[in-house]
């Protein structure tokens, strides 16, 4: 009888110990590293200088099944051209593809200016003083600024989105892409044009 009781006590102890092991507290930790590509450039002499003011990072929003959009501000500096009667500033996309080495999937970055899509084929006009178009870049388009001999600056902003994706050369939805990171350059070309009668630059 004593042996039976002892066996019961031992069994109960083992069971209790098992439950105690399952209930042990634990700590789980995750870390992520963010990387910024860094380059320092100073240019205060060129006729046109455009400087992006932030980098672009798109994150997939699982609930929306799409990537978030980014507002990318940029600084524009021009060297006024004395004698100019009109000034025009236009832009178009040069490169906008993100890719990765783990597979052949690609993402296309769309660029919008005041809601209008920029393209690779046609210039999007930002400023045209002959038509009174300034697109909010009033400081550059002001009479006595673009046609002066001084430098002037203003700030604009593009909206960047992940417009579409492809895999194996065919269009695919974002949800079908495997997890990972895509990298690449988004390049927008700006062209500034002054029309007027200019004094020839002195010979060096």
Task: Place the predicted regions along the sequence by residue.
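Gram-negative bacterial Sec-dependent N-terminal signal peptides
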Residues: 1-25
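Compositionally biased, low-complexity repeat tracts
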Residues: 3, 68, 76-79, 128, ...
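A generic short-segment signal for beta-strand/edge and adjacent turn/coil regions
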Residues: 3-7, 38-45, 55-59, 123-129, ...
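Alpha-helix boundary/interfacial micro-motifs
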Residues: 15, 21, 132-133, 197
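N-terminal small/polar-rich segments of proteins
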Residues: 24-117, 161-164, 169-204
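A broadly tuned preference for mixed-charge, low-complexity surface segments
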Residues: 25-31, 90-95, 128-146
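Extracellular/luminal beta-rich ligand-recognition
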Residues: 104, 108-137
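Acidic, glycine-rich flexible loop segments
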Residues: 130-173
């Amino acid at each position: 009888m004593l042996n039976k009781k002892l066996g019961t006590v031992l069994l109960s102890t083992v069971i209790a110990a098992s439950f105690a092991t399952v209930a042990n507290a634990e700590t789980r930790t995750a870390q992520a590293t963010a990387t910024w590509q860094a380059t320092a450039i100073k240019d205060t002499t060129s006729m046109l200088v455009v400087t992006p003011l932030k980098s672009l990072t798109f994150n997939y929003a699982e609930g929306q099944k799409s990537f978030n959009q980014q507002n990318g501000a940029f600084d524009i500096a021009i060297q006024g051209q004395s004698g100019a009667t009109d000034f025009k500033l236009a832009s178009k996309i040069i490169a906008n593809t993100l890719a990765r080495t783990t597979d052949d999937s690609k993402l296309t970055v769309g660029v919008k200016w005041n809601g209008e899509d920029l393209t690779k084929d046609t210039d999007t006009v930002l400023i045209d003083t002959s038509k009174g178009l300034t697109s909010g870049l009033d400081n550059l388009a002001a009479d006595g600024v673009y046609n002066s001999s001084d430098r002037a600056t203003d700030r604009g902003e593009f909206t960047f989105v992940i417009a579409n994706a492809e895999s194996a050369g065919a269009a695919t939805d974002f949800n079908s892409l495997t997890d990972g990171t895509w990298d690449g350059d988004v390049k927008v070309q700006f062209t500034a044009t002054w029309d007027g009668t200019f004094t020839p630059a002195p010979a060096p």
